[in-house]
A protein has these predicted regions:
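Catalytic-loop motifs flanking and including active-site residues across diverse enzymes
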Residues: 14-17, 89, 116-119
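Charged phosphate-binding loop/patch that engages nucleotide di/tri-phosphates or the phosphate backbone
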Residues: 117-132
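Short, glycine/serine-rich, charged loops/turns that create anion-binding
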Residues: 9, 46, 124
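Electropositive, glycine- and tryptophan-enriched low-complexity nucleic-acid-binding patches
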Residues: 1-33
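Helix-centered, glycine/charged polyanion-binding patches within enzymatic domains
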Residues: 30, 35-40, 45-110
């Protein structure tokens, strides 16, 4: 997990304003000096949209998105099951975040405070992982 978008209301589906979120994430990576070309995006079936796939392809990002059974048809999309198994790392991180009471429920009124708490949590998670 190298970047995140700003918080969105919980009453929308995963694809709500997804291109704006992706633009925000790519701008964050660019500002940090991280090259995004050639990276891959592992996403679950909730993000299975031809628009998302085309947007990522236009940015030279590999879309490794599990197909949503409701969207099946004549599509021939790339999907690497082995690569997708690494998504467990993201799910484990999300579960760890859910275990932190201050992060589980959004008490902050300002988006910047919510984002800052999450960045602090990610830093703590990273430091624990490298055992500093």
């Amino acid at each position: 997990m190298i970047a995140m978008g700003s918080p969105k209301a919980g009453n929308h589906n995963d694809l709500y304003e997804i291109e704006e979120v992706l633009k925000e994430i790519l701008a964050f990576l660019e500002e940090a000096g991280i090259e995004h070309k050639g990276l891959f995006l592992n996403a679950d079936a909730g993000f299975d949209s031809q628009g998302v796939r085309e947007y990522l392809e236009g940015k030279d990002i590999v879309a490794n998105i599990r197909e949503n059974p409701r969207n099946r048809g004549e599509r021939d999309n790339y999907f690497d099951e082995k690569l997708y198994e690494r998504r467990f790392i993201i799910e484990r991180t999300n579960a760890w975040i859910d275990g932190q009471k201050a992060l589980l429920v959004r008490y902050e009124k300002l988006d910047v405070n919510w984002v800052t708490l999450h960045l602090l949590a990610f830093s703590l998670f990273f430091l624990r992982k490298i055992k500093v």
